[in-house]
Swiss-Prot record:
It comes from the Bacteria. Its main location: secreted. This is Bacteriocin curvaticin FS47. One of its GO terms (biological process) is defense response to bacterium. It is found in: Secreted.
């Protein structure tokens, strides 16, 4: 991820979350996207 892609992922966490995160619902997707960005 670049910094821009990271921000985009955080901004659309419900869509850009990892598969495992998405399986946990919106909150899981948010965490998945944020962890990937970091």
């Amino acid at each position: 991820y670049t910094a821009k892609q990271c921000l985009q992922a955080i901004g659309s966490c419900g869509i850009a979350g990892t598969g495992a995160g998405a399986a946990g619902g919106p909150a899981g997707a948010f965490v998945g996207a944020x962890v990937v960005x970091i």
